[in-house]
Swiss-Prot record:
This is Serine--tRNA ligase. The gene is serS. It catalyses: tRNA(Ser) + L-serine + ATP = L-seryl-tRNA(Ser) + AMP + diphosphate + H(+); tRNA(Sec) + L-serine + ATP = L-seryl-tRNA(Sec) + AMP + diphosphate + H(+). One of its GO terms (cellular component) is cytoplasm. Residues 43-63 are annotated as: Disordered. Gene3D superfamilies: Bira Bifunctional Protein, Domain 2 (3.30.930.10), Serine-tRNA synthetase, tRNA binding domain (1.10.287.40). Catalyzes the attachment of serine to tRNA(Ser). Is also able to aminoacylate tRNA(Sec) with serine, to form the misacylated tRNA L-seryl-tRNA(Sec), which will be further converted into selenocysteinyl-tRNA(Sec). One of its GO terms (biological process) is seryl-tRNA aminoacylation. GO terms for molecular function: ATP binding; serine-tRNA ligase activity.
Length: 426
């Protein structure tokens, strides 16, 4: 979340910057609450000082043999008023905190200004889409032809937006995840982690999925115990490794990577991508998270994005990189690059990775800090996250870009060591 001090001291400037994201900050309400808070706090502090003085005078009056009953009554009355003032302050602060939790991050000055995805700016492209000399099939048809993709059986078990993978296609799905993890750990310096798939609300609060995006989550209610949520991304569990920690500066940067299933209700996706594996309730993803010093986070974003790009380059899949505009960025991001891979059957690029610098937005919620070696004082870290990559969508891209005229699929060179001798899926 944003720094409350920044909000109080630069309220209109913050509102103007948020407006570029299409977010209307209720300046009048915040100003009114701040005025109430100051009034109650000033009154409470004055009352506390007066009560302290009266309490002191009770002892003095007692020594002089005076009647202390009136003073005792005053002190008791003031105690009640102080309790009432504390309750009032807590109520005001609770509303301010609620407003603060609903405010998105401030965009970096380098982020393009725009209202929606039409305002995104293409940064670069890599590779050239194949010019097929036969009628291409989409991944659903290819999967059904080879017997490796079964949506009907999955729907019978679980309903819409689920897939059953079998045989060589299931192996390729696993191979992709193994290849990505091996690349990021061996060449990009990430530490592999295996994390819980179920987390409590504070973990999701820390990474900003809660309270704003609860409808996108799958929740498990338990009698007498804290509710649990299925993770929508391993970003949640990886980033929360540093929740509540004060790190030594020498430990930074921390770079974590995990392969996990992800679970999303897709509450706002009705009617979109209903065919195939593009948008699922359950999908696998390899997630990268970095925890860095504030001065290095923008440079780290470039490196994180390059790490995700390297997966696509080694798979020889054409892609492009977009700098997301202010109106299309995620809630917690300062700046985001999206990677979009070429999907031949759709004749367009589709998102396969989103790489974001969240600045200190998540760290402030989690109280994730490092000790500044120059001042000796704890300061908030910066956190970054990115898909490296979404495994299901990468499988879609491989199936379609490596298809042959007879409906078979060539195995990319970098995946062959993981495929037990299979070079063509038929």
């Amino acid at each position: 979340m944003l720094d409350s001090k920044l909000l109080r001291s630069n309220l209109q400037d913050v509102a103007d910057r948020l407006a570029s994201r299409g977010f209307a900050l209720d300046v009048a309400r915040i100003e009114a609450l701040e005025e109430q808070r100051k009034t109650v706090q000033t009154r409470t502090e004055a009352l506390q000082a007066e009560r302290n003085a009266r309490s002191k005078s009770i002892g003095q009056a007692k020594q002089r043999g005076e009647d202390i009953a009136p003073l005792m009554a005053d002190v008791e009355r003031m105690g009640t008023e102080l309790s009432d003032g504390k309750v009032e302050l807590e109520k005001i602060q609770s509303e301010l905190d609620s407003i603060l939790l609903g405010i998105p991050n401030l965009p970096h000055e380098s982020v393009p200004i725009g209202e929606d995805e039409d305002g995104n700016v293409e940064v670069r492209r890599w590779g050239t889409p194949t010019a097929f000399d036969f009628e291409i099939k989409d991944h659903v048809a290819l999967g059904e032809l080879t017997g490796g993709l079964d949506f009907e059986t999955a729907a019978k078990m679980s309903g819409a937006r689920f897939a059953l993978l079998r045989g060589p296609i299931a192996r390729m799905h696993r191979a992709l995840a193994q290849f990505m993890i091996n690349l990021h750990t061996a060449e990009h310096g990430y530490e592999e982690a295996y994390t819980p798939y179920l987390v409590q609300a504070p973990a999701l609060m820390g990474t900003s999925q809660l309270p704003k995006f609860e409808e996108d989550l799958f929740k498990i209610s338990r009698d007498g115990e804290a509710d649990l949520y299925l993770i929508p991304t391993a970003e949640v569990s990886l980033t929360n490794i540093v929740s509540g920690e004060i790190l030594d500066a020498k430990q930074l940067p921390l770079k974590f990577v995990a392969h996990s299933p992800c679970f999303r209700s897709e509450a706002g996706a009705s009617g979109r991508d209903t065919r195939g594996m593009i948008r699922q309730h359950q999908f696998d993803k390899v997630e990268m998270v970095q925890v860095v010093e504030p001065s290095t986070s923008m440079e780290a974003l470039e490196g994180l994005t390059a790490n995700a790009e390297r997966v696509l380059q080694l798979l020889e899949l054409p892609y492009r990189v977009l700098a997301l505009c202010t109106g299309d960025m995620g809630f917690s991001a300062v700046k985001t690059y999206d990677l979009e891979v070429w999907v031949p059957s759709q004749d367009k690029y589709r998102e396969i990775s989103s790489c974001s610098n969240c600045g200190d937005f998540q760290a402030r919620r989690m109280q994730a800090r490092f000790r500044n070696p120059e001042t000796g004082k704890p300061e908030l870290v910066h956190t970054l996250n990115g898909s490296g990559l979404a495994v299901g969508r990468t499988l879609v891209a491989v199936l379609e870009n490596y298809q042959q005229a007879d409906g078979s699929i060539r195995v990319p060179e970098v995946l062959k060591p993981y495929m037990a001798g299979v070079e063509v899926i038929r």
